Amino acid sequence: EVLEDGQPQKIETFKRISVTGTPTGGGEPAREIRSEYVEEAEAAREDVRMFVIFLDDYHVRRGASMAVREPLIRFLQNDLGPLDMVAIMYPLTPVSVVRFSRNRDILAGAINNFLGRKNEYEPRNDLEQQYANYPTETVERIRNQVSLSALKGLVTRLGGMREGRKSVIVVSEGYTYYLPPELRNSQAGISTPGQNGVSSVTGNDPNEFRARMML
């Protein structure tokens, strides 16, 4: 039985689709994605799974980002098939330039470069320079907005690529407006004593060594 808004719907056609990321007998082989045209054509196939790994560097501590690299690369190497398409995105990545790939070496290299910046406020681009003199609490709100807006844009783009399921893997420690007193500063771009631009909240904090992966 299929319901829509609580009302039963008539089933006119039914098709079972089992997708494993591996070509079936007689199926088309995986094509190397070298252009947007090939990307769109491959994404339209029913036997292709699509994944986006969203590396939320604004909300992952440096140590946690290093710890999560290995399990992400294992996922690429062991859990994906040759047909699967994967893209990597950061909060500041324009959704228009997000590209999918089947090259596991390139994807693994990108993951190995992932470095979290949670509680680090040194500006690295013109956008961040604009609010470098804001209080750290304000910067955290801006970072939340940037990250969530990027996810919304990503979901919109994925929805326009084809019907069916797409998966977004969000690597983040979560969103919060709270900062411990030692990280509060009237100017985010100026390091507090003992920080030198890097969060001094390490030690036994378990979040320093763990990032949540949310599907």
Which residues does each predicted region cover?
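Scaffold/interface architecture of coatomer-like assemblies
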Residues: 1-215
